[in-house]
A protein has these predicted regions:
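Structured, active/binding-site neighborhoods that engage oxygen-rich ligands
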Residues: 1-350
Length: 350
């Protein structure tokens, strides 16, 4: 039987992502000295209004695409149960959402060049494999993948394939695919009650088990675009190997990581997908029972602070549920209604 936190895991994760995003946007592109001038990092205030970036916008886009592709809002016993999510249906829904985001007047939050370029090319009939940034492994691939870890009723193959597809439509590098799959799996494990201390080993095991699994049903011939392997298996293995190396750095950093140290110095600045996950994990695992502190730590970094804090918030919220976050913060974060709609639907169907 699910405990109280698990019953609101989806809502907690989505709000955590948005709150981390809103905290981290004002500090993005600032060095540690400039951030320190704002005051103690443990007291970093949530801006008012709590405006978010493309991280939250695209997370909502992925969530809405999942709903459209399954014909439901996440409940069990209907068209959204396991087996209903197909690559063709999800690709159509993601394309529609990504193109709408590209043209939206609210798409003015310093979005990444790779996402913009790919979404512009998706506006038409060309195959998505020809629109993607084939050599890009930017964190735009996995900053938005949390919904794949939260939506109930998916098979393991659907969850992994869909996580990689949503990444691959804009970021075609194998590490972007693997890191997105791994990020979604981390969110799922925590939502299901995995203890934080066991998470790194569980992620390492998952990466090892999937190292040579190329999801051809979902990815088609994507592996042939960047020359990163002679076979589909070699292509995807190169991405998982970079994720495993990032987990190595995470596990090496954890024992001696001081709370006032910049996590980016240990696990990377987070501009690329595997570093964004590793550094977010470092923030979360250093403060597993202090979710607000975890996202503040992610926001007060020299790197891609909004994405690091957003992923850390998604992890913390998946574990602790909506009670992790101050009610006053949740009430004023941008896109509150959309976050609540998705989270409630998926929590109800859990």
């Amino acid at each position: 039987m699910a405990n109280a936190a698990q019953r609101t895991a989806a809502t907690g994760s989505l709000f955590g992502l948005a709150l981390g995003d809103a905290l981290g946007w004002p500090t993005e592109f600032k060095d540690t000295e400039a951030i320190a001038a704002l005051g103690p990092w443990r007291e970093l205030p949530l801006p008012d209004p709590a405006v978010v970036t493309d991280d939250t916008q695209m997370t909502l886009a992925v969530g809405r695409a999942l709903q459209a592709a399954t014909g439901h809002s996440g409940g069990t016993g209907d068209a959204g149960d396991a087996g209903s999510l197909t690559p063709e249906g999800l690709e159509r829904a993601l394309r529609e959402e990504f193109v709408a985001w590209y043209h939206s007047p609210e798409n003015n939050r310093a979005p990444g060049h790779t996402c913009l370029a790919a979404c512009r090319l998706l506006d038409g009939d060309r195959p998505w494999q020809q629109a993607t940034g084939a050599g890009s492994k930017g964190c735009g691939a996995n900053m938005r993948v949390a919904p794949l870890g939260l939506m109930p009723g998916l098979t393991d193959e659907e969850r992994a394939g869909a996580a990689q597809l949503q990444a691959g439509m804009t970021h075609g590098h194998p590490t972007a695919l693997a890191a997105s799959d791994l990020t979604a799996h981390a969110v799922r494990l925590l939502a299901e009650g995995c203890p934080p201390g066991g998470l790194p080993a569980a992620l390492r095991a998952y990466a090892g088990d999937n190292r040579t699994v190329y999801h051809e049903r979902w990815l088609g011939g994507l592996w042939q675009r960047p020359a990163l392997g002679a076979t589909p298996e070699e292509f995807i293995a190169s991405g998982w190997d970079e994720c495993l190396a990032a987990l190595d750095r995470l596990e090496a950093a954890l024992p001696g990581f001081g709370p006032d140290s910049d996590p980016c110095a240990a696990t990377g600045d987070g501009w690329i997908a595997e570093e964004a996950l590793a550094t977010a994990l470092l923030c979360f695992l250093r403060f597993p029972d202090e979710p607000v502190t975890a996202i503040r730590r992610g926001a007060a970094t020299r790197g891609d602070s909004d994405s690091i804090a957003a992923i850390a918030g998604a992890l913390a919220g998946a574990r602790l549920g909506i009670a992790a976050w101050p009610t006053a913060w949740c009430d004023r974060v941008e896109y509150r209604t959309g976050l609540l709609r998705l989270g409630t639907a998926w929590d109800t169907g859990r």
